[in-house]
Amino acid sequence: MQEAPLMLKNKTARRIKDIPGFVFPGGVKVIINFTVDFDAMIFRKFLREPKLWCAQGEFGGRTGLWRLLDVFGEFDVRTTLFLPGQTGLLYPEVLRRAVREGHEVANHMWDHHIPPTLEEEAVHMDRTDTLIKGLTGQYPAGTRSEHDLAALRDHAYTYVSYTPQGEFPFYVYYENIGKWMLKLPLSFIHDDAMFFYFGW
């Protein structure tokens, strides 16, 4: 077991702790975790842009996620959809289908940015959590967002999946809120957003 002090952006010390004796269940050697950041249209629809511009961003909600769910169903794969709340307002039907088919829906901010104040951040988190509960019947278990620690303290998330810090799950202890959080690393290399950042 290793513990190492690190510094966060807000100068708060934390400790990282590997999960002792961690093994995947059932003798599995490798696990691939499929997640979808369902960010469709949040940068366009609410800006009241011209219709032709908006049409470029409609694919994810009108077609893309539906097709992904078809593929996941064909291969009996369950995944996690990280949802900005505004996207949930725009495309509730595809999310209801995802829930019916056993997929998890988790918090990915309200409009894909972290507000400048804790008060606004708490409002955004609550709005997204409430919307997800309305769609799924339960509050989300995790988040993919760089939320302030003080904001995380008041939410019942069991995991955070935001940074590519390793290959295996691990725990992080946040000193100023006295709470351990499970970290599920991600890989930006396999994130298709990398290919589109400069085109939008």
Model-derived features: positions:
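Catalytic grooves of carbohydrate-active enzymes
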Residues: S187-W200
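Catalytic alpha-helical scaffold of carbohydrate-active enzymes acting on polysaccharides/glycoconjugates
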Residues: Q2-I189
